[in-house]
Amino acid sequence: MRLCTIALFAIHCLLFTSCTKEGDTIYKPTPGEEQLATTPLVTVIYGPNSLGDRSYCDLIYKGVEAAAKQYGVRTLQLAPESEEQGLAYLETMFRQMENATDTVRRLFVTPSPVYDAYIRKNNKRLEKNPYADLLYMETTTPLEGKGSTFYIDYYGAMYMGGCMAHYGVEDLLTVLLANPYTQTVREAGEGFIAGYNDSPHWNDRFPVQLHVRYLSDEPVGGFTMADTTAMRIYQEEKHYFSEEKDNNVTFVPICGGAMHAIFRALHTNSLLYDYDCYVGIDGDMCYDNESCLFSVVKHIDKVMVDYIGLWLKESMPKHQTLGLADGATGTIREGYQYAGANGYEYFKKRVDLDSLRQVAIRKEVERYEK
């Protein structure tokens, strides 16, 4: 309790000074480069243990810091260790904003569904402060009262990924979903599976079976995973068809930071099973050209830069849905080495990627017109 009290006191101080917090480390400005306490402040409160996932949340961090450099704002990025700690951070900030008497502009960003109920219950408290604003993502349901929301539709990009997964995959294609409840996860999985089912397989000599697997049955579960659990899942998928015989596996990990435990399991066994691979999700993972078939990406870092710019101009939209047509999502094919060809050349010979993108955009839009 004492540590929590100290942490909350530190946040209180940081809200009115010029520092940046990453995890448990507080960075003070370089001497001679101090920013005035009147400089606009962007505060991000991540979900529990989500920063450091090397994908979605790390891209948000990257985007916020890029915006700080571009626009000259201060940043405070908080990585709570538990939901309780994150809620305590939020309560401290809301209380301070209710009582603040200065005119410093502050934007609070919450990129986690863990805080959904709290945000929707308390966001109106910020209406007492004309200089405080809120950005909650990702959700399809706008906030009542103060605050903006946006949603990045992953269906189209994942549809492309499902079509492309036919090329270079043998035996088993395993889609790992964090849970069946989180909307972003569920719709991403639906898009990938639809794209896969709508496309012909590249070679009938090498049949492929699609296997969908959930990591958790909890509404916000499945985004973290122990290495031992990942190794068990890996071995189960390796023997999906037979206990006596190994099969090739391609993993599609739509499960946040848990994907990296799967990657470690895959790389640990790479000398034994050199045909196993994965599809990178959220971030560009094509640097791993031995194992990453291609990447389906969310450009959340660029979206954050744009939104902070809109906030500074006082033109942040109340709600917005972005997707493949907006450039908020896409696929990256560079890097993968297969039969002597890099990823882009390999897919270009087999798929009309421009036409596929247009089909995927249409599929994404059609879902909202029904």
How would you describe each model-predicted region?
Residues 274, 283-339:
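Flexible loop/turn connectors
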Residues 36, 42-63, 67, 76-87, ...:
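Extracytoplasmic "Venus flytrap"
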Residues 149-173, 296-316:
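Hydrophobic alpha-helical segments within soluble ligand-binding/sensing domains
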Residues 127-153, 283-289:
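Flexible loop/hinge segments that line or gate small-molecule binding clefts
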Residues 44, 100-113, 135-137, 241-256, ...:
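Periplasmic-binding protein-like
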Residues 184-246:
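Extracellular/periplasmic Venus flytrap/periplasmic-binding protein
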Residues 64, 159-207, 212, 319-349:
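An alpha-beta-alpha
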Residues 15-18:
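C-terminal motif of bacterial Sec signal peptides marking the signal peptidase cleavage site
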